[in-house]
């Protein structure tokens, strides 16, 4: 049997299925989102690094969303009156889902293209240069994968299909922000009460459409839970690192909220 079949990816077997060795060496599906087959023809393509097609425009829109997120928190007395340490812990845990809700609310769209992969020689030269310079930062940090970005885009599309209003977005942000399960909180009981209040407010907004609102509420909460599975590193690498470089978003938000 010939191994040089045209149009067959090296990660595929003769029947078009992933080879056993490739499957063993690939990352666990628990840590990597899997896109439907319609988006890609093979596992190799799903793992390819990608970058924004219009980084300056998209990063500017992402920064606008981040600023609106800060404004939302500043105008929320129930958050501002919490102990500063609790504010920091909630921010560290919840900034990603809040930012994603902001992207969905502002209908931010973006396209990605395959990122060039540096040659082995270039990697060796970069490693030698960085090892010879004290305090040098690694410049070959992996780009986001196509699978991860497509997963993120599908989450945003799902929220757009819900057509949430401003009040629904606001109360949903409250249910995500006030998470009493964040470790180390001093006022966890009070935060649990705030989360319940936000949940009740969301239910009241949907009440005029009862009983259909029950199914809508379930869909909203289900979609919100998926946002927590999108890693913050993906958001930083995709939306902020192309323009701002390596940045700690949590520290940036703390500075903007005057928590440090």
From Swiss-Prot:
Tissue specificity statement from the Swiss-Prot or TrEMBL entry: Expressed in islets of Langerhans (at protein level). Expressed in a circadian manner in the liver.
Phenotype on disruption: Mice exhibit a significant disruption in the circadian rhythm of several important hepatic genes involved in the metabolism of lipid, cholesterol, fatty acid and bile acid.
PROSITE patterns: NR_LBD (PS51843)
SUPFAM superfamilies (UniProt xref): Nuclear receptor ligand-binding domain
Modification Symmetric dimethylarginine, positions: 57
Post-translational modification: Arginine methylation by PRMT5 enhances repression activity of metabolic genes in liver in response to bile acid signaling, by increasing interaction with cofactors.
GO molecular function: nuclear retinoid X receptor binding; nuclear thyroid hormone receptor binding; peroxisome proliferator activated receptor binding; protein domain specific binding; protein homodimerization activity; protein-containing complex binding; transcription corepressor activity; transcription regulator inhibitor activity
Residue ranges of every copy of the NR LBD domain listed in the record: 16-260
Chief location category: cytoplasm
Swiss-Prot/TrEMBL GO biological process terms: animal organ regeneration; bile acid and bile salt transport; circadian regulation of gene expression; circadian rhythm; negative regulation of DNA-binding transcription factor activity; negative regulation of DNA-templated transcription; negative regulation of gene expression; negative regulation of transcription by RNA polymerase II
GO CC aspect terms: chromatin; cytoplasm; nucleoplasm; nucleus; protein-containing complex
UniProt keywords, alphabetically: Biological rhythms, Cytoplasm, Methylation, Nucleus, Receptor, Repressor, Transcription, Transcription regulation
InterPro entries attached to this UniProt entry: NHR-like_dom_sf, NR0B1/2, Nucl_hrmn_rcpt_lig-bd, Nuclear_hrmn_rcpt
Subcellular location, record wording: Cytoplasm; Nucleus
UniProt key word Thylakoid: no
Known role: Transcriptional regulator that acts as a negative regulator of receptor-dependent signaling pathways. Specifically inhibits transactivation of the nuclear receptor with which it interacts. Inhibits transcriptional activity of NEUROD1 on E-box-containing promoter by interfering with the coactivation function of the p300/CBP-mediated transcription complex for NEUROD1. Essential component of the liver circadian clock which via its interaction with NR1D1 and RORG regulates NPAS2-mediated hepatic lipid metabolism. Regulates the circadian expression of cytochrome P450 (CYP) enzymes.
Quaternary context: Heterodimer; efficient DNA binding requires dimerization with another bHLH protein. Interacts (via N-terminus) with NEUROD1 (via N-terminus and C-terminus). Interacts with ID2. Interacts with NR5A2, PPARA and PPARG. Interacts with RARA, RXRA, THRB, NR5A1 and NR1I3. Interacts with EID1. Interacts with NR1D1. Interacts with RORG. Interacts with NFIL3 and BHLHE41. Interacts with HNF4A; the resulting heterodimer is transcriptionally inactive.
UniProt similarity note: Belongs to the nuclear hormone receptor family. NR0 subfamily.
Protein's UniProt name: Nuclear receptor subfamily 0 group B member 2
UniProt gene name: Nr0b2
